[in-house]
From Swiss-Prot:
One of the protein's GO biological processes: tetrahydrofolate interconversion
EC number: 1.5.1.5, 3.5.4.9
Reaction catalyzed: (6R)-5,10-methylene-5,6,7,8-tetrahydrofolate + NADP(+) = (6R)-5,10-methenyltetrahydrofolate + NADPH; (6R)-5,10-methenyltetrahydrofolate + H2O = (6R)-10-formyltetrahydrofolate + H(+)
Molecular functions (GO terms): methenyltetrahydrofolate cyclohydrolase activity; methylenetetrahydrofolate dehydrogenase (NADP+) activity
Function: Catalyzes the oxidation of 5,10-methylenetetrahydrofolate to 5,10-methenyltetrahydrofolate and then the hydrolysis of 5,10-methenyltetrahydrofolate to 10-formyltetrahydrofolate.
Listed pathway(s): One-carbon metabolism; tetrahydrofolate interconversion
Ranges in coiled-coil conformation: none
Protein name (database record): Bifunctional protein FolD
Subunit structure, interactors included: Homodimer.
Gene: folD
Amino acid sequence: MNNIIDGKALANEILADLKLEIQELTSQTNASPKLAIVLVGDNPASIIYVRHKIKNAHKVGIYTLLINLSATIHTNDLISKINELNLDNEISGIIVQLPLPSSIDKNKILSAISPSKDIDGFHPLNVGYLHSGISQGFIPCTALGCLAAIKKYEPNLTGKNVVIIGRSNIVGKPLSALLLKENCSVTICHSKTHNLRSITSKADIVVAAIGSPLKLTAEYFNPESIVIDVGINRISSNKIIGDVDFENVQSKVQYITPVPGGIGPMTIAFLLKNTVKAFKDSLYTLDT
């Protein structure tokens, strides 16, 4: 049954276009985009994610600067390092790999990144732009990846009933804003939602982002459902699974993303797309 939304293939299309765009920009400006990645501590999952980001950045011609910092660093010292990157004109975009150690004030750190370099879209100003409907700033990459995956198979979203399970600032909230802009009727569910199955089973599109392995079984969906699984649950050193019971759900829905190979590659593709946007915005700023 060929109903799998191949996030890796979709991401490769985006990366191929980005590579050509960067080559053209470099030939015109004699400059290239550069991404600074701040990694605090030695969280094994974070190290793997950072490696994927660097590998794909190099594929398309984005230079990377990896800054490894001790897990014992103080919040103010980390802010000082971010301020250095904010002032470095060669740096197009900055990301601080999450999660951070509990001793660090995450909100202060994300707010310290210059909004013009905040390619993760987590700065309060960028969050405000998105939820105010202002086409400016940066949008969180996972939300962008989810929307692109959905629109590949359902280009016209007007009037669609969408259920998002999860209310995080990374997926649930930003994706709800994007889908409202597409004229969807959006319901956000979470851990306190009652009768979840009765809500999701009536939806045209279900986005699962709860971090609960194989939580959603076939009974949560209908035959016309488009299922987007954002869950990344590591059950061993070399195996991850999603929030959806893929093996039993796949044959009973219209389309579904796998884990791995679904939204993960799309997230990285849009991170790099945001980096190129930041680079182009900086060129415009320098010209004015």
